[in-house]
């Protein structure tokens, strides 16, 4: 079998067409003479020059053009030049359109943009883990948003939930024994979200926590004095930072996260108007 010269044509990067072509050639034990990519071909005036080059080199065309007008022009021109052409997307798009009764978006590069969104989420999740519970105060400067709150205000699960939305979140516990990170005062207060909870609810949660680990009534963790002290420290800090404060009492993680996302959306809209 003669080694083929393969020309990949795409209105995006051409990675999909090249990957499929290499996979197909491997079934014949062939290494292509070369695979040349013509990427971001999004207008018909480029087509004749490309097809002429392929014809001169006795090559074949494999393409993943999603723009219908460009795809039809490429297929027609290749036939006119007698160039073998494989349309990877056209038949599939047509069949899916017929099956689902909807028109394709015809937007090149959507897989790539979806991949980028996926990897952004992965990076955000890793960031949330690395910056959980105040373990890396310097992360505050790289975060999209910072959650602050006393113990049992759902900071960690909220950080993970918001990370799934692609947001880089740091959460900082507010406890009397720990120094408040200086970095909190170096960022825009709009990036800080305080999480507060009622004394009654917090007392109940902490008492149940102690029971679950076999230490009912132990220490000061669930004492009135301790809880009053922590709530006072939080209120003072939130006031000093002039940050947005959200009451999480009796709210599910999803509900609180949704309120945070709504608040974030309002910040974005406000900044766009400035």
UniProtKB/Swiss-Prot annotation:
Keywords per UniProt: Kinase, Nucleotide-binding, Serine/threonine-protein kinase, Transferase
This protein's record includes keyword DNA-binding: no
Pfam families named among the record's database cross-references: Kinase-PPPase
Annotated HAMAP family: PDRP
Family classification: Belongs to the pyruvate, phosphate/water dikinase regulatory protein family. PDRP subfamily.
Catalytic activity reported: N(tele)-phospho-L-histidyl/L-threonyl-[pyruvate, phosphate dikinase] + ADP = N(tele)-phospho-L-histidyl/O-phospho-L-threonyl-[pyruvate, phosphate dikinase] + AMP + H(+); N(tele)-phospho-L-histidyl/O-phospho-L-threonyl-[pyruvate, phosphate dikinase] + phosphate + H(+) = N(tele)-phospho-L-histidyl/L-threonyl-[pyruvate, phosphate dikinase] + diphosphate
NCBIfam families noted in UniProt: PRK05339.1
Protein's UniProt keywords contain Nucleotide-binding: yes
Species this chain originates from: Listeria welshimeri serovar 6b (strain ATCC 35897 / DSM 20650 / CCUG 15529 / CIP 8149 / NCTC 11857 / SLCC 5334 / V8)
Sites where the protein binds ADP: 149-156
GO MF annotation: an example: protein serine/threonine kinase activity
Stated name of the protein: Putative pyruvate, phosphate dikinase regulatory protein 1
EC class (word): transferase
Function noted in UniProt: Bifunctional serine/threonine kinase and phosphorylase involved in the regulation of the pyruvate, phosphate dikinase (PPDK) by catalyzing its phosphorylation/dephosphorylation.
EC number: 2.7.11.32, 2.7.4.27
Disulfide pattern: none
């Amino acid at each position: 079998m003669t080694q083929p010269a393969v020309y990949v044509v795409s209105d995006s990067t051409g990675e999909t067409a090249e990957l499929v072509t290499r996979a197909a050639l491997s079934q014949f034990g062939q290494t292509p003479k070369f695979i040349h990519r013509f990427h971001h071909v999004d207008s018909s005036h480029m087509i004749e020059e490309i097809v002429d080059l392929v014809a001169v080199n006795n090559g074949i065309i494999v393409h993943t053009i999603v723009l219908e007008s460009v795809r039809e022009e490429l297929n027609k021109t290749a036939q006119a030049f007698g160039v073998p052409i494989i349309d990877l997307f056209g038949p599939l798009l047509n069949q899916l359109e017929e099956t689902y009764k909807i028109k394709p978006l015809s937007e090149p590069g959507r897989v790539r943009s979806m991949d980028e969104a996926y990897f952004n989420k992965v990076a955000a999740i890793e960031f949330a883990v690395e910056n959980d519970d105040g373990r890396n105060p310097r992360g505050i400067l790289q975060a999209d948003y910072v959650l602050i709150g006393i113990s049992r205000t759902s900071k960690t699960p909220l950080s993970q939930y918001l990370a799934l939305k692609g947001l880089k979140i740091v959460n900082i516990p507010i406890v009397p024994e720990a120094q408040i990170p200086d970095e909190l005062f170096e960022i825009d207060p709009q990036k800080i979200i305080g999480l507060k909870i009622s004394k009654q609810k917090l007392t109940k949660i902490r008492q149940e926590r102690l029971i679950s680990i076999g230490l009912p009534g132990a220490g000061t963790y669930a004492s009135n004095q301790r809880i009053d002290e922590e709530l006072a420290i939080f209120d003072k800090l939130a006031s000093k930072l002039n940050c947005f404060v959200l009451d999480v009492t009796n709210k599910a993680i999803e509900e609180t996260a949704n309120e945070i996302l709504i608040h974030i959306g309002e910040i974005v809209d406000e900044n766009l108007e400035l």
